[in-house]
Swiss-Prot record:
This is Aspartate--tRNA(Asp/Asn) ligase. InterPro entries: Aa-tRNA-synt_II, aa-tRNA-synth_II, aa-tRNA-synth_II/BPL/LPL, Asp-tRNA-ligase_1, Asp-tRNA-ligase_1_N, Asp/Asn-tRNA-synth_IIb, AspRS_core, GAD-like_sf. It is found in: Cytoplasm. The lineage of its organism: Bacteria, Bacillati, Bacillota, Bacilli, Bacillales. The record marks 84 as: Important for tRNA non-discrimination. GO terms for biological process: aspartyl-tRNA aminoacylation. The keyword Nucleotide-binding applies. Its main location: cytoplasm. It comes from Bacillus cereus (strain AH187).
Length: 591
């Protein structure tokens, strides 16, 4: 078999007159009665091959048997297309290859999906036949971008003198948040490894070990409820450094992301990135990962509501809640009563009891609650919300968390429905000054807002023992277009501070020692100040490639039920395998 001389998508007018050896898949076959045209595809693109009896009767006879997705080796001569046959939409659209020889390297059955960007296959079918789905150019281009992003990050961190170090996949189960994936040990009866939710503890131990600058393209595993932008196994760019301040870390990440955007996406972005405190983000956008590509911020009306004539508003404020609103500019005519009812049902998903609304008309406010506001209150309301005729005003009165969640989600929905979002924009944002702990009423205890190893502000360390809910974290999240790209922080590096943190989280001294004794001891041997960040590679690629589903950025992803339709994992195992592990199944009966 002759060696390939050209990739299909790289045959241009410079090759006219040359004999070329091409290898690839049949994208399309057209029989024009005496002439057969084949679009031959490889990962670089498509080239048109012509089978003409005047050039080679033998090649034409073989071409008559060829079908879509056959794998071919074609030898032929590159010629220019006639004036009327030029296709400027193709990189190879000014030439074609006159075939002199063709060899079928492999035949193909009729494929269950159309191998084209606009395939008609459902996602389940695409995942079952993932190896065919990956042939589509849009999929290859996504993974080419993933490669480019990873390469750029590696090159950047190399110039910054970071070492790439691998950390264990089989590790210890620790209570870090999501459920662990457990792996039974054959050697140690009744004991289990856990797959890492992140390399958090090991990267901190590398700082104890004096490596100073570490990174890893790390596989992480979390047994949690899935959604469109989550997978049970995912990849993060894990970065940690000693002796750097928060400002130095943020500056370095901005330089890295600027280079990624330029090299992998061809987009120039400016740094430094805007910054917003967690409290400000929640107050203005109802989200800790605000999409700043459009306006429509939340407005706090609690002070106004306390003295207005609408009991729903006043009672919410009196019970310690708040009233907030968003002004959908010019949207009054675009939303019927039925449409607003749909918005009401939407906010109920986030815990809201309802959605109050008003339309602004030339002669004043109209809507079911307009009667509760006199002229003076109506003017205050309109001035506060900067409302003019044609605007739609939407209100939620409830607990602060419910108001934020419901209006934050409603804002995003309206942004999409009203086409307010400029999809060409890439708005990076740092969200800083997070709360260190969050209180869970159901569990009646505090949980770490990020993780238990986040350093509080120095002046807040004592609050861990007196008022944990007031302690602030030296933490920062990088947000892009309303998605959390990654989170980081300065880390606790002193044993006494870490013990106070564990105590605030409800760990007894014995539990802390049992779970994290190795880390606490490490902190007694001269641990340097350190911090870092972990960026979600899958999510970053999803946003840069313009995909809407994280599964499109992972070669062989899982479904929403954490199963692989291609290999049918997870699957039962043989009884002998269980016996070898000294395990016995006790399955719950389905009701």
């Amino acid at each position: 078999m002759a060696e390939r001389t050209h990739a299909c998508g790289k045959v241009t007018v410079e090759a006219v007159g040359q004999t070329v050896q091409l290898k690839g898949w049949v994208q399309k076959r057209r029989d024009l009665g005496g002439l057969i045209f084949i679009d031959l595809r490889d990962r670089t693109g498509i080239v048109q091959v012509v089978f003409n009896p005047e050039t080679s009767k033998e090649a034409l006879e073989v071409a008559e048997t060829i079908r879509s997705e056959y794998v071919l080796h074609v030898e032929g001569t590159v010629v220019e297309r006639g004036e009327g046959a030029i296709n400027d939409n193709m990189a190879t659209g000014r030439i074609e290859v006159q075939a002199t020889k063709v060899n079928v390297l492999n035949a193909a059955k009729t494929t269950p999906i159309i191998i084209a960007d606009d395939t008609d296959a459902s996602e389940d079918v695409r995942l079952k036949y993932r190896y065919l789905d990956l042939r589509r150019p849009v999929m290859f281009n996504t993974f080419k971008m993933r490669h480019d992003v990873t390469k750029t990050i590696r090159n950047f961190l190399d110039t910054e003198e970071f070492l790439e170090v691998e950390t264990p996949i089989l590790t210890k189960s620790t209570p870090e948040g999501a459920r662990d994936y457990l792996v039974p040990s054959r050697v140690h009866d009744g004991e289990f490894y856990a797959l890492p939710q992140s390399p958090q503890l090991f990267k901190q131990l590398l700082m104890v070990g004096g490596f100073e600058r570490y990174y890893q393209v790390a596989r992480c595993f979390r047994d949690e409820d899935l959604r469109a932008d989550r997978q049970p196994e995912f990849t993060q760019i894990d970065i940690e450094a000693s002796f750097l301040t928060q400002e130095e870390i943020l500056d370095m990440m901005e330089r890295m992301m600027t280079k990624v955007m330029k090299d992998a996406k061809g987009v120039e972005i400016s740094a430094p990135f805007p910054r917003m405190t967690y409290a400000d983000a929640m107050a203005r956008y109802g989200s800790d990962k605000p999409d700043t590509r459009f306006e429509m911020e939340l407005t706090d009306l609690s002070e106004f509501a306390a003295g207005c004539g609408f009991k729903v508003f006043t009672s919410a404020v009196e019970s310690g809640g708040q009233v907030k609103a968003i002004n959908a500019k010019g949207a009054a005519s675009k939303y019927s009563r039925k449409d607003i009812d749909a918005l009401t049902e939407f906010v109920k998903v986030y815990g809201a009891k309802g959605l109050a609304w008003l339309k602004v008309e030339e002669d004043g406010l109209k809507g079911p609650i307009a009667k509760f506001f006199g002229e003076e209150d109506a003017n205050v309301l309109m001035n506060t919300l900067e409302a003019t005729a044609g605007d739609l005003l939407l209100f939620v009165a409830d607990k602060k968390s419910v108001v934020a969640d419901s209006l934050g989600a409603l804002r995003l929905r309206l942004g999409k429905e009203l086409e307010l979002i400029d999809e060409s924009k890439f708005n990076f944002l740092w969200v800083t000054d997070w709360p260190l702990l969050e209180y869970d009423e159901d569990a009646d205890r505090y949980f770490a807002a990020h993780h238990p190893f986040t350093m509080p502000f120095r002046e807040d360390v004592e609050l861990l023992e007196t008022a944990p809910e007031k302690a602030r974290a030296q933490a920062y999240d990088l947000v892009l277009n309303g998605y959390e790209l990654g989170g980081g922080s300065l880390r606790i590096y002193e044993r006494d501070v870490q013990e106070k943190m564990f105590k605030a989280l409800g760990f007894s001294q014995e539990e802390a020692q049992e779970q994290f004794g190795f880390l606490l001891e490490a902190f007694e041997y001269g641990t340097p100040p350190h911090g870092g960040i972990a960026l979600g590679l899958d999510r970053l690629v999803m946003l840069l490639a313009g995909r809407t589903n994280l599964r499109d950025t992972i070669a062989f992803p899982k479904t929403a039920s954490a199963s692989c339709l291609l290999t049918e994992a997870p699957s039962p195992v043989a009884e002998a395998q269980l016996e070898e592990l000294n395990l016995k199944l006790s399955l719950k009966e389905e009701k």
